[in-house]
């Protein structure tokens, strides 16, 4: 039990979180979504040397503080911050961290995260409700005529009729409270039962409880538990509520019993031990399911608080209890397992790699196997008694507390089945996600919020952070960056929120193509400097639902496109418009199917999302394998093998463009297995239906040889490769491993043609310009989206 006062949880906003509240805090524009939450966890994990147990508890101590509310009428000054952990959620969190999960803050969050990232993570894991009226209620939760007529005026600060619930994120299987899930995992990795008599005698607990309450509680527990004993060998065993050594399990406190105790303590004394009067669950909705930022509580009575156990907390409590059962076994199997990996695997269709049946889409069955109503009643009743002494000013006798708890458990068990059905989503077969550097440009049809919606959706659909892809936003008229390419959605939206650039009033296609060309050149120069041998392809997605380029712009666009295709071979263009005629005539020379045309029925974002999901997100845009820079003045440019990973059930696609194959006697591409499982590598050329495939066992390698890959000037299809995992050993422990079941491998190639981009070698442009024009490719190469 923690007694060091310096480590205790206090209600004031800690120093490291002051930036999140001073002046109202920074604007947090990123979506409150699972993928964004995981990206922040990964950034912390990448720079941390703590194991999962220490990392989880330190995370709870450094960025979580439940129950922070703004004072009703206080004004902020240099010496007064009108925010404090004064709401009911604080008391449970303080007991959890002080008594059941004692720890120190060993994380330097500011070292890994920006202020915006830190504050977003804090808001995601800290349970509280913003209760005060904001001014947008007429839009978000309008009143009926009868309600407006019955309203009364007040000089006091008014509570909102749809307050915002913080500490929640959106997942495919319902909105959850991630702080609860982390608390469950941390408790499972440091599982303990804490004796009630020890709690009542601990200075850290009784210093804030009146002496009269303490004496009454000790007398009750001593008198009522004289004839009972308890077997505590298993933390999940059933226990009697009045045993002589009665104790409370920290896993239950962190999950369902802790939240249910809040219902008992906060509602029970007011409504009594009646199941039909106790409120469990909540009625919520997001401001926008595509760009979820605010989670509104749609309450029945703005004068009464009834959000003591919300839907998000219930789902997270169930998920946390499920994960807690398995965590010690999984960590024993893989000591390098990370918190982000466990959470991502659970909220995925594939499930946790150590136990695939453990996944959110199987939540209903898992809950039936894990829940024990007797145990829930016992743990909730005991913790409610401890919580009540700290939180309320009236002493509630133990027997009355038990009756209220029994009613609360009944209410909870009656409510949960409908909540689970409502948030159930069938497990689906996993899909491939292309790894690309995406550049988006729009015309005047879309304004600020439309663009934000689309960028939020595409960032999640492409799994930008997890897949190491990037997204950037170009000004459709000037070709300047509104937001430069980023693989961090939080940072992307921070820059977007702070941008002072006016939205485009039209599309200037030549400016957009020029910007893509500059980006491609800069990327190629970075590749040369980094000695890269493979990487992401660039995809320029141009939205022009309402605009059409002029004849002069089309001519200029054709010239720029020819220049771009002449130097940079792995750049794809996708045009989305209601009328595609003009865009289909921009590139009529380089027929390598690096263009895609998406016909939109309207200018709406939803129609654009449907088209992009069908033709791009569900496609197989390949990554690029490319040759080195040609020697310049005696300087040789070497390349290093490319490291990559594949997730079981998915594929990684690669392409060698014909330019790198031409005039070469032998091109060799070698794949070396890094030892975490077996992989299958297949190679083919153009539209060949027969693939040359090779299974590569752990630590083995295999080389694909292309002898005279281009037998004639007019016939040179690209070389394509696809990698999949046949088996996994769950050994992926590298910091770049997204999941433990990934299988790593290296790609090394020799014999490819060099790229004359730098120095005197660039003068050879005219020599190979004509060679890139492949008139017969249209007959032999499949459209990349169908591969």
PLM regions with names:
Residues 368-438, 445-450:
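Acidic, polar low-complexity linker/tail segments
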Residues 407, 411, 546-600:
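VWA/integrin I-like adhesion module and closely mimicked acidic/polar interface patches used
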Residues 754-772:
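C-terminal GPI-anchoring signal of eukaryotic secretory precursors
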